[in-house]
Amino acid sequence: YSSAALFGGLDYEMASTKVRNIVSTDHNSGKFRNGQNGYHELPYTLNEVNNVNSLLKEKKIKTNLFVGENGTEKQFRALDGKAVSLIHIATHGDYKELKQREADDAMKHCFLIMSGANATEENNDGLLRADEISTLNLRGCRMVVLSACNTGQGTLGADGLFGLQRGFKNAGVQTILMTLSAVDDQASMLLMTKFYENIISGLSERQALIKAQQYLRENGYADSKYWAPFILLDAGKSPIPHPSKS
């Protein structure tokens, strides 16, 4: 990896009315990274990206950290066409499963929730949807890490699964680390920190994830709900080369 964009510790209080209407208003649930349990702060996502940032810098990897008010949809869109080899997003994620005949619309119903600094702008409402991601040029990005709930979910259509993973693959990303269910905020931070420790020690993405999951099981998070949701898509393949600039 040569450069990374890291999003976490996002300021959800800035989000638009549109976003607030989508997620629940029940703030008494546990700290899971989806909209189902309320639109609450995720304090460990800030720890997570700070840990990742420090680990990558140790390896002299150039990082851009987007936290608080700066973790907006507009900032993510600005990665369009940039040669960023790693993108990490720690936030709320969710999806609405549609019927198979509605699969063409499913990409509009799988999303990540970003900070709402530009919520008044039509195209930057705080919801980063799969259909929007699919229009970007993220070729050359070796891996996207989606540290949020349900980021590997979607609607099954005739041409496969329609969700965030399809959005990022259409954008040209090679490997995706995603989740198949809700994930715990603190456990996710621990897993991701260990995952990157393993990466910088020389392990492959797949080996790094297996070791990180094992670490959780052996350190107070034996229940599969804490570590099993995380899976890799297309790990170990070569990235699509980013077009050279003339």
Question: Language-model segments: which ranges?
Answer:
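Catalytic cores of enzymes
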Residues: 1-246
